UniProtKB/Swiss-Prot annotation:
InterPro entries: Capsid/spike_ssDNA_virus, Parvovirus_coat, Phospholipase_A2-like, VP1/VP2. Residues 1-39, 95-120, 141-184 are annotated as: Disordered. Mg(2+) binds at N323. The N-terminus of VP1 is sequestered within the mature capsid. It contains a phospholipase A2-like region and nuclear localization signals that might be exposed by capsid modifications during virus entry. The keyword Cell wall biogenesis/degradation does not apply. The lineage of its organism: Viruses, Monodnaviria, Shotokuvirae, Cossaviricota, Quintoviricetes. Belongs to the parvoviridae capsid protein family. It comes from Canine parvovirus type 2 (isolate Dog/United States/CPV-N/1978). A motif (Nuclear localization signal) lies at residues 4-13. GO terms for biological process: adhesion receptor-mediated virion attachment to host cell; clathrin-dependent endocytosis of virus by host cell; entry receptor-mediated virion attachment to host cell; microtubule-dependent intracellular transport of viral material towards nucleus; symbiont entry into host cell via permeabilization of host membrane; viral penetration into host nucleus. This is Capsid protein VP1. The keyword Magnesium applies. Interacts with host TFRC.
Length: 727
């Protein structure tokens, strides 16, 4: 007889939990709630400390702080008790030092040695005080701030000894930061790690690194700029060319990594969409390191030559808007995120935001004289909102060798499906019983219900007939909805195209035609266009959503008749029929059946150019989804990261002389690194038949490898090829 299976140690765990309490083992299965999940992560971190020779029970550790942060909004009693227990421990226990900021839950974290510094560094280090020298040694041995938890106050971490006021900055003429000139302060990592967990879950850690080039701003001033292109829109029929708006142009730049192509290469994405059924967005962190600042001067010779010098006293200004004070400006909508190629330097986009500007546009038509009427109302004083980073967000000053880390942001988003649905209203529920089945193969041999339509049993909402058919049977809800198709609406700031949920809407499949609100992307060489392309014309593609919205815009129609009477022309409205005698305006332009019975899928992730997450609207009635990103952050989203080369003035600067400062031409190169963590569910096969998966043909294969002069491109990939039932 086999010995009984050894049971996992339960420890002192209260009822309803598996990990919240001391003495339990780490193999109790899936946590029961978010507090229990935080306790499991806390236990795994403690195990990592113990393996590295540290005793976390006697000290307050970063793992304790992380548990406090994760349970600060806990609704369950166990999470609340654990939260206040570790807050009490924080108040009385000494801090655990010389440990990783965030021990890995998958393997022990070991300090990593940096490259040996040049000899002159030791001369500078020898002059330091004993305490300062010890701190430098710890900084040189400590790993990067991967996994550092962003504190409640949202303050990032800056590794810069000058900020301590101890006079322990590294040598090098007043610059050099904590690492010093010649000492690397970080690692370059673009690997995607897949960690397979219990019950079909996978933890996906996407690492991304880029060399970022930043020039000093054209001006140090904020500017309010109005764009007026009435020369384009003054002609009848050119309303779609309207660009009139107002914006604030700032001296800052935005480091935006909110696009799928920043994080995953084409091979990674193929693996994800072929094997996973859904994605959960977990956490995000980023940092700046190995900052380099240089000045540019020109010689007086003819022709002049440029001279580049390291400036160890110049500064890079960095600001993290962790509280989302600034206007939210995702750069993916303009294809201005960080580049998609890890080996190619990239640039941050100049940061700007919209400013209130009212106007009225009355379009003209052939029956009127003159041009379209534009009435400018300007800015309403009641609506003025002018934001500046300098007095709204803490600004950190980095010099050569310094580094900056944001800490970890944890998302609160609904999951994103990697499967599509095909069922429309006609495929919901129990099909009719067939009295007659085909007796031979062939497409012309059909089944037959065999019962007269008015003799069948079932439920309809047709009050004037007893017919029960596939057209009249009552379904539980409405799959999809008819939406305004290619429609423009008016707002107080000008016309806009009505956003609609994308989905497979009919027979149109050409990439230059959006079948039913399918997004069309235009992008340049940093974001997928062939890298050896010449000229300014961007490359484009239309993402044809694979899922079915339940609607057929090209063949749609509306019928409103007495059901038991013959159909007349006046009782049916076709897509080509005009409304109110207006030629070309029909019900598909204005008809909307969205309502409380509507069932709708989320938008698909669009690789590589699509946006990943979006900010929730600050309105009382929230939209159920956003058409530009599958993940909508509840309450808050990751803070935007702004950078700017600080003014490097000359002795000729006179604040009263002109609007432009007398500045030394200065630019910065720095390394950016981020980590984006997902949890994914492995897709289980429940059908007998195999399914289509993301693949490429022989011709497309060579898009992903360079040519003899380095030319290559990224082709968009489908993300929801596997079908699923919705009912």
């Amino acid at each position: 007889m086999a010995p009984p299976a050894k049971r996992a140690r339960r420890g002192l765990v209260p009822p309803g939990y598996k990990y919240l309490g001391p003495g339990n083992s780490l193999d109790q299965g899936e946590p029961t709630n978010p507090s229990d999940a935080a306790a499991k992560e806390h236990d795994e971190a403690y195990a990592a400390y113990l393996r590295s020779g540290k005793n976390p029970y006697l000290y307050f550790s970063p793992a304790d702080q992380r548990f406090i942060d994760q349970t600060k909004d806990a609704k369950d009693w166990g999470g609340k008790i654990g939260h206040y227990f570790f807050r009490a421990k924080k108040a009385i226990a000494p801090v655990l030092t010389d440990t990783p900021d965030h021990p890995s839950t998958s393997r022990p974290t070991k300090p990593t040695k940096r490259s040996k510094p040049p000899p002159h560094i030791f001369i500078n280090l020898a002059k330091k005080k004993k305490a300062g020298a010890g701190q430098v040694k710890r900084d040189n041995l400590a790993p990067m701030s991967d996994g550092a938890v962003q504190p409640d106050g949202g303050q990032p971490a800056v590794r810069n000894e000058r900020a301590t006021g101890s006079g322990n900055g590294s040598g090098g003429g007043g610059g050099g930061g904590s690492g010093g000139v010649g000492i690397s302060t970080g690692t370059f990592n673009n690997q995607t790690e897949f960690k397979f967990l219990e019950n079909g879950w996978v933890e996906i850690t996407a690492n991304s690194s880029r060399l970022v080039h930043l020039n000093m701003p054209e001006s140090e001033n904020y500017r309010r700029v109005v764009v007026n292109n009435m020369d384009k829109t003054a002609v009848n029929g050119n309303m779609a060319l309207d660009d009139i708006h107002a914006q604030i142009v700032t001296p800052w730049s935005l480091v935006d990594a909110n696009a799928w192509g920043v994080w995953f290469n084409p091979g990674d994405w193929q693996l994800i969409v072929n094997t996973m059924s859904e994605l959960h967005l977990v956490s995000f962190e980023q940092e700046i390191f190995n900052v380099v600042l240089k000045t540019v001067s020109e010689s007086a010779t003819q022709p002049p030559t440029k001279v580049y010098n390291n400036d160890l006293t110049a500064s890079l200004m960095v600001a993290l808007d962790s509280n989302n004070t600034m206007p939210f400006t995702p750069a993916a909508m303009r294809s201005e995120t960080l580049g998609f190629y890890p080996w190619k330097p990239t640039i941050p986009t100049p940061w700007r935001y919209y400013f209130q500007w009212d106007r009225t546009l009355i379009p003209s038509h052939t029956g009127t004289s003159g041009t379209p009427t534009n009435i400018y109302h300007g800015t309403d004083p009641d609506d003025v909102q002018f934001y500046t980073i300098e007095n709204s967000v803490p600004v950190h000053l980095l010099r050569t060798g310094d580094e900056f880390a944001t800490g970890t942001f944890f998302f609160d988003c609904k999951p994103c499906r990697l499967t599509h649905t095909w069922q429309t209203n006609r495929a919901l529920g129990l099909p009719p019983f067939l009295n007659s089945l085909p007796q031979s193969e062939g497409a012309t041999n059909f089944g037959d219900i065999g019962v007269q339509q008015d003799k069948r049993r079932g439920v309809t909402q047709m009050g004037n007939t007893n017919y029960i058919t596939e057209a009249t049977i009552m379904r539980p809800a409405e799959v999809g909805y008819s939406a305004p198709y290619y429609s423009f609406e008016a707002s107080t700031q000008g016309p806009f195209k009505t956003p609609i949920a994308a989905g497979r809407g009919g027979a149109q499949t050409y990439e230059n035609q959006a079948a039913d609100g399918d997004p069309r992307y235009a992008f340049g060489r940093q974001h997928g266009q062939k890298t050896t392309t010449t000229g300014e014309t961007p490359e484009r593609f239309t993402y044809i959503a694979h899922q079915d919205t339940g609607r057929y815009p090209e063949g749609d129609w509306i019928q409103n008749i007495n059901f038991n009477l013959p159909v007349t022309n006046d009782n049916v409205l076709l897509p080509t029929d005009p409304i109110g005698g207006k030629t070309g305006i029909n019900y598909t332009n204005i008809f909307n059946t969205y309502g409380p019975l509507t069932a709708l899928n989320n938008v698909p992730p669009v690789y590589p150019n699509g946006q990943i997450w979006d900010k929730e609207f600050d309105t009382d009635l929230k939209p159920r989804l956003h058409v530009n990103a599958p993940f909508v952050c509840q309450n808050n989203c990751p803070g935007q990261l702004f950078v700017k080369v600080a003014p490097n003035l000359t002795n000729e600067y006179d604040p009263d002389a002109s609007a432009n400062m007398s500045r030394i031409v200065t630019y910065s190169d720095f390394w950016w690194k981020g980590k984006l963590v997902f949890k994914a569910k492995l897709r289980a096969s429940h059908t007998w038949n195999p399914i289509q998966q993301m693949s490429i043909n022989v011709d497309n294969q060579f898009n992903y490898v360079p040519s003899n002069i380095g030319g290559m491109k990224i082709v968009y990939e489908k993300s929801q090829l596997a079908p699923r039932k919705l009912y």
